[in-house]
């Protein structure tokens, strides 16, 4: 966090990428300078619970969701629109609690390459495309691949989606964590990967809110037609 975040930030700024920052609310208390840098950069903050305790192990899941949303809103001035559960964990009640707390989209359901509307007892929530394979924890910490796997796997994944996008829009999520993607021996692979993807015609880098807004105004209408 103290070093890797700033390396990633330089890459994002160099390539004009405004990512979604999936934020444990506790970071607002422990590393406020990092959260402020995200806000100053114009990056979206979404909630990642208070800390990394799995949702099914919380004594009061609803209270932790509300606490997390409130802390980030108080610090940033904006209530998060999105939510990622720690380790993508949920219970059967999570979506209902999230909808009640004002969450509009989640990234916990790795089920499609396009947004999907999910009904809850409150208001619908949109599941945005997430990927647990183009993900630095999986590639580097769990599967123990060399650093260049970052570039090769991401481009292989992108090439298929790019070809399919000739028929309908596709979305590709890439997960970066400062302590993995922000280290010296990986950061060049991260930068090269994003640069090559963005060099293709018709490709844009959007945060979660932009994807959500597109889906709510155009995507669902396209599917209904």
Segment roles from a protein language model:
Residues 1-126, 151-174, 180-225:
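Catalytic alpha-helical scaffold of carbohydrate-active enzymes acting on polysaccharides/glycoconjugates
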